[in-house]
């Protein structure tokens, strides 16, 4: 297998100018484990810092838009849509980030960046109630960040 970002001259951004614009979609998911009491506070809108889910959605969308600034060899991509959604478990929130574009390269890095930043934002918003008496986070954990779907298709 040949690496596309590295050659004998060093690191490079892959040339995609010759590629055809195609519909691209990627969906990434990840979870944050939280204390059940914290989940309850989020659902009831009682986190002192503010609306946890709205903050996570905004942060995730912004992160998707800035992926090319964060990951050095990613192309700036003209996005057509981003959705950040949440599913609750007893002791976790699962975040899903769906990214869409019509472009020459895929959007999976954007979806992974969006879900990661949304999860980090949730952590930031709830850290006051997640800390133990020593200021540590024995229960809080971000896990299972992954791409669950990637689509590339021609559209007429």
UniProtKB/Swiss-Prot annotation:
Protein name: Probable cyclic pyranopterin monophosphate synthase
Family: Belongs to the MoaC family.
Stored Gene3D superfamilies: Molybdopterin cofactor biosynthesis C (MoaC) domain
Complex and partners: Homohexamer; trimer of dimers.
Protein function: Catalyzes the conversion of (8S)-3',8-cyclo-7,8-dihydroguanosine 5'-triphosphate to cyclic pyranopterin monophosphate (cPMP).
Membrane spanning stretches: none
Catalytic reactions of this protein: (8S)-3',8-cyclo-7,8-dihydroguanosine 5'-triphosphate = cyclic pyranopterin phosphate + diphosphate
Entries under HAMAP family matching the protein: MoaC_A
UniProt keyword S-adenosyl-L-methionine present: no
Keyword field: Lyase, Molybdenum cofactor biosynthesis
Record: active site: 124
Protein species of origin: Pyrococcus furiosus (strain ATCC 43587 / DSM 3638 / JCM 8422 / Vc1)
Source lineage: Archaea, Methanobacteriati, Methanobacteriota, Thermococci, Thermococcales
Pfam families registered for this protein in UniProt: MoaC (PF01967)
Pathway linked to the protein: Cofactor biosynthesis; molybdopterin biosynthesis
EC primary class: lyase
InterPro entries: Mo_CF_biosynth-C_arc, MoaC, MoaC_sf, MoCo_biosynth_MoaA/MoaC, Mopterin_CF_biosynth-C_dom
Molecular function via GO: cyclic pyranopterin monophosphate synthase activity
Presence of keyword Acetylation: no
Superkingdom per UniProt: Archaea
Signal peptide coordinates: none
GO biological process, one term: Mo-molybdopterin cofactor biosynthetic process
Record: residues binding substrate: 73-75, 109-110
EC number: 4.6.1.17
């Amino acid at each position: 297998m040949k690496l596309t970002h590295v050659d004998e001259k060093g690191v490079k951004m892959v040339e995609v100018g010759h590629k055809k614009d195609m519909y691209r979609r990627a969906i990434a998911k990840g979870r944050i484990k939280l204390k059940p009491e914290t989940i309850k506070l989020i659902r009831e809108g009682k986190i002192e810092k503010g609306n946890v889910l709205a903050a996570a959605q905004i942060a995730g969308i912004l992160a998707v838009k800035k992926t090319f600034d964060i990951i050095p060899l990613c192309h700036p991509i003209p996005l057509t849509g981003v959705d950040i959604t949440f599913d609750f478990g007893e002791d976790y929130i699962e975040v899903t980030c769906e990214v869409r574009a019509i472009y020459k390269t895929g959007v999976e890095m954007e979806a992974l960046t969006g879900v990661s930043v949304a999860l980090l934002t949730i952590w930031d918003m709830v850290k006051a109630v997640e800390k133990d008496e020593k200021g540590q986070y024995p229960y809080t954990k971000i896990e299972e960040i992954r791409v669950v779907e990637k689509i590339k298709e021609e559209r007429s």
